[in-house]
Amino acid sequence: MKYKSIMLLGTASSVGKSTVAAAFCRYFKKKGYRVAPYKALNISLNSFVTKEGDEIGRAQVVQAEACEIDPKEYMNPILMKPSAGFKTQVIVRGKVHCTMDAYKYKELNKYLKEKAKEAYDDISNDYDLIVLEGSGSCAEINLRETDIANMHTAKIADADVILVADINRGGVFASIVGTIMLLTEEERKRVKGVIINKFRGKREFFEPAMRQIEEIIKIPVLGVMPYFDLDIEEEDSASIKLRKGNGKGIDIAIVRLPHMSNFTDFNSLGRIKDVGIRYAENPKDLENANMIIIPGSKNTIDDLIYLKESGFKEALINESSNGKLIFGICGGYQILGEKIIDSLGVEGDIREEEGLGLLNIVTSFNKEKTTKQVVAFDLEGNEVSGYEIHNGESVPTAKENIWIKEKNGNVLGMNNKEQNVFGTYIHGIFDEGDFGEKLINKLKKELNIEESNEVNYKDYKMSQYDKLCELLEENIDMAYVENLIRS
């Protein structure tokens, strides 16, 4: 049976649309619906590669997990990844379409709208219920003509809309009323309810205000979602929640690169007992860390130059000499090498830049982007898995330091001879299997900290989605929402 699509739109960015959409996905999955997520256009440096080798935003991966289905490219047909110099890489249905100047977006608009509709039609054929998510504010009147992800999608899908507003940042009533007022009459008719998100306090004291806002906008408030401390992956690095340690366990420092991407690579480490994760904003922040991670980058050469100019290069080399564990992922792996060559100008005008020299690799960028899921093996024969998203190829200059290889011999990771500096192209390496847990337990053993056996990461995430679903059921009128999808 086919049901009417439901759409979550926001009064602003970071109001919690992605998480509420994930909660809806989990709710409908547990109710027995064949449900899938869809977001026409995502702007994010945080991406994932599907089994088919297609690149999509991670928010829809989280939502697909909540639905217990495999992520597919049609769940996020347009992904825009900002680069340096006001450039944006445009990914359409999982593949790189072009890199454009941000101001040329209008020229692509018609084509992108066609592709978004095509993807929606495809996903609608495969599933009975689609939970749609918008992007940013749905009432940006200067963007109405070029809108793809918000009311344009609601119209294409003929979806009813639930408006999500964030009370934690203040001004929630003005943002709700202002958003509704700025919509056209046709758009307002689609809005069938409001969810007030991130509420702190007792609901009974808030009820009178809810009734007042209903009187003003003539739309029901379906409930208030409380501010919660669940471990649900955030969409972008601006809102990342890192888990700080108590000074008695493992301290992991993430070097905060200006063009950092795929920050979710280290999320799973933060759930491990006695592990704290924090950003290193300056070189001194590395001094007390037990492990340093250099994450992925959307502009590796620029970030490498930043490390040199900010003093991070010297600090990282010193920490390496002192035996500290340093781990580079993707762009971080390339940065740890001897040299990066960009003869084709893939990233910009700089054609060559010396790396930190901590790993024996030379990286050459090329026009083709590698996007695929991988299964590989380390030196001890342990399986590691994840996905690749990168331009270029890194060639070992000392084969005795090869650390991770695929069965076909393709090198995906290196270490130094002292075996305290490691790098790999594999995103998600800490998520799958027990690689991350083994690494942390090795550190714990060295520091005389009790080792721990953690719950499987997939099971852990499912438990978090279940708790999120419980919060939704307890606080939001989901019977009303179910009536909407059956109307």
Curated annotation (Swiss-Prot):
- Gene Ontology molecular function: any one: catalytic activity
Q: Which Pfam families match?
A: CbiA, GATase_3
* SUPFAM superfamilies xrefs: Class I glutamine amidotransferase-like (SSF52317), P-loop containing nucleoside triphosphate hydrolases (SSF52540)
Pathway terms, separated by semicolons: Cofactor biosynthesis; adenosylcobalamin biosynthesis
GATase cobBQ-type domain mapped to chain residues: 249-435
Q: Where is the active site?
A: C330, H427
Per the record, the GO terms for biological process are: cobalamin biosynthetic process
Alphabetically ordered keywords of this record: Cobalamin biosynthesis, Glutamine amidotransferase
Q: What domain of life does the native source organism fall in?
A: Bacteria
Q: Which HAMAP family match?
A: CobQ
List the PANTHER family: COBYRIC ACID SYNTHASE, DETHIOBIOTIN SYNTHETASE
Annotated family: Belongs to the CobB/CobQ family. CobQ subfamily.
As for what it does, the entry says: Catalyzes amidations at positions B, D, E, and G on adenosylcobyrinic A,C-diamide. NH(2) groups are provided by glutamine, and one molecule of ATP is hydrogenolyzed for each amidation.
> What is the protein's given name?
Cobyric acid synthase
**Gene name per UniProt:** cobQ
